[in-house]
Amino acid sequence: MTTIVSVRRGRQVALGGDGQVTLGAVVAKASARKVRRLYHNKVLAGFAGGTADAFTLFERFEAKLEKHQGHLMRSAVELAKDWRTDRILRRLEAMLVVADHEATLIITGAGDVIEPEQGIAAIGSGGAYAQAAARALLENTDLSPKEIVTKALTIAGDICIYTNQVHVIEQLD
């Protein structure tokens, strides 16, 4: 799996992920890019799960953003609806975290669109570790969202065997 974490402080949001791709018990790639900017660089998105499945979902989500003029919630709900009802999409195994200046959402293959509390979203095998670290840092420091994401990914990578220390982090100011 992987670790994807997003932290929001006001309208500033950062989203990051590690680069490890595993095939069974073997690390197949250490520097995969699981975080992207979408819709004219106004939306951040990261995935955990099957890489090919995630790319399909990125394409679908970007099409929804275009159709709905960048409206994050509506695009996420429409993607989740398609994901839940389409026979082919239903088989895709991935989760997404998406964020813009206004909201952060987790989108699942079960059709869930969740807006997490406290401005923190985390998915993947190291998600719980990253979420705990990010929450402690957000509540007890003045670090920027990008600094918190970096530290949370580092901590998750130290604990989770499916998460490495090669990070890609994007930020919207």
Curated annotation (Swiss-Prot):
PROSITE patterns: PROTEASOME_BETA_2. The keyword Ion transport does not apply. Na(+) binds at G157, C160, T163. The keyword Hydrolase applies. Transmembrane segments: none annotated. InterPro entries: ATP-dep_Prtase_HsIV_su (IPR022281), Ntn_hydrolases_N (IPR029055), Proteasome_sua/b (IPR001353), Proteasome_suB-type (IPR023333). CDD domains: protease_HslV. Allosterically activated by HslU binding. It is an enzyme of class 3 (hydrolase). Pfam families: Proteasome (PF00227). Keywords: Allosteric enzyme, Cytoplasm, Hydrolase, Metal-binding, Protease, Sodium, Threonine protease. A double ring-shaped homohexamer of HslV is capped on each side by a ring-shaped HslU homohexamer. The assembly of the HslU/HslV complex is dependent on binding of ATP. Protease subunit of a proteasome-like degradation complex believed to be a general protein degrading machinery. This is ATP-dependent protease subunit HslV. It comes from Nitrosomonas europaea (strain ATCC 19718 / CIP 103999 / KCTC 2705 / NBRC 14298).
